[in-house]
């Protein structure tokens, strides 16, 4: 009998199921995957290096462009890290608004992931339904910050501006009618025979394996570990809000889908609580060395004009030191580590992207599965190459 050779198959980088610019070299034994080798770096833009040449405020928009489907979560991590170095306390209204928008961002991210994961295995309807709801949330982004995606809204010292009149009421209206659409998708997918055949038992992973690979977020919780930074290391006002941590049992593609569906419902509840408890007051720190003065003040005071000019030309100087802050981003633990040398620019900024750890386990998760399952596995990882390649 002649020697049997495995076949090498290139998957991507132009493949629609690759979720961006993933090049995957698959070693196949017939239809079965023997090895999956992800080639990353096709979207590398040198973000961490670029940040070293910008002031602390100018570095902020780079974070929107990392995981570009959940931008505000990353701004949040960066702002918290800079505030930790500055030892700056922000007003309570700013904290509530930050949490409100971070939870809307979580909904935004999970809607995209669930609908595209369903599309990858052949279900088109959820995409058409859920993108309609995403559009409404992007409109809230636009009304608050002026941009649909790259908001640059959460800034060190507070927020860019207060929300316009009527926005809170419109978010409240949206949150009331939104669960109906989630119920519709739930009905369409959760007990669907074909959906379950494509996702149940695919790339199962245990808690120990998930921790060994550095998983976080829904990927870790789907394996059965109730680890959520909003509960275990509360930041902002999460310790004053009431929510549950949904977990899975088997750590397979189906459980990851269920965890994300449950997280959307928890985020809806958190948004409602933020709206009910929303206090009045300022939205940025009063420290004029960090946050710009109000427009009205600049028309009357020369001091205010000088502060404004200095802030936007030179930027503020951050005390020497280092800080690491992680937030529970929709994809997992998103961390920012900044080393400051006392100047107006970060000496070093290291970004911990959750998707990076998830993608490195792809070989382990895909081994022994069929070629058709690779689309379901990649869809369940929820990877975006902006943050992986940085």
From Swiss-Prot:
Cellular component terms per the entry's GO annotation = plasma membrane
* EC numbers: 7.1.1.-
Major enzyme class: translocase
Keyword list, A-Z: Cell membrane, Membrane, NAD, Quinone, Translocase, Transport, Ubiquinone
Covalent S-S links between cysteines: none
- Organism's domain of life? Bacteria
The UniProt entry, under PROSITE patterns, shows: COMPLEX1_49K (PS00535)
Keyword match Transport: yes
Q: Does the keyword NAD apply?
A: yes
As its record notes, the protein acts as a catalyst of:
a quinone + NADH + 5 H(+)(in) = a quinol + NAD(+) + 4 H(+)(out)
The record, for InterPro entries, names: NADH_Q_OxRdtase_suD, NADH_UbQ_OxRdtase_49kDa_CS, NDH1_su_D/H, NiFe-Hase_large
The entry lists its GO molecular-function terms as: NAD binding; NADH:ubiquinone reductase (non-electrogenic) activity; quinone binding
UniProt subcellular location: Cell membrane
Q: How does it sit in the membrane?
A: Peripheral membrane protein
For this protein, the record's NCBIfam families field holds:
NuoD (TIGR01962), PRK06075.1 (NF004739)
The record's similarity note reads: Belongs to the complex I 49 kDa subunit family.
- Function, in words: NDH-1 shuttles electrons from NADH, via FMN and iron-sulfur (Fe-S) centers, to quinones in the respiratory chain. The immediate electron acceptor for the enzyme in this species is believed to be ubiquinone. Couples the redox reaction to proton translocation (for every two electrons transferred, four hydrogen ions are translocated across the cytoplasmic membrane), and thus conserves the redox energy in a proton gradient.
Describe, as the record does, how this protein assembles with itself and its partners: NDH-1 is composed of 14 different subunits. Subunits NuoB, C, D, E, F, and G constitute the peripheral sector of the complex.
Question: HAMAP family in the record, alphabetically?
Answer: NDH1_NuoD (MF_01358)
PANTHER family named in the record: NADH DEHYDROGENASE [UBIQUINONE] IRON-SULFUR PROTEIN 2, MITOCHONDRIAL (PTHR11993:SF10), NADH-UBIQUINONE OXIDOREDUCTASE 49 KDA SUBUNIT (PTHR11993)
- Protein name in UniProt: NADH-quinone oxidoreductase subunit D
Query: Could you tell me which species this protein originates from?
Result: Wolbachia pipientis subsp. Culex pipiens (strain wPip)
Q: What is this organism's lineage?
A: Bacteria, Pseudomonadati, Pseudomonadota, Alphaproteobacteria, Rickettsiales
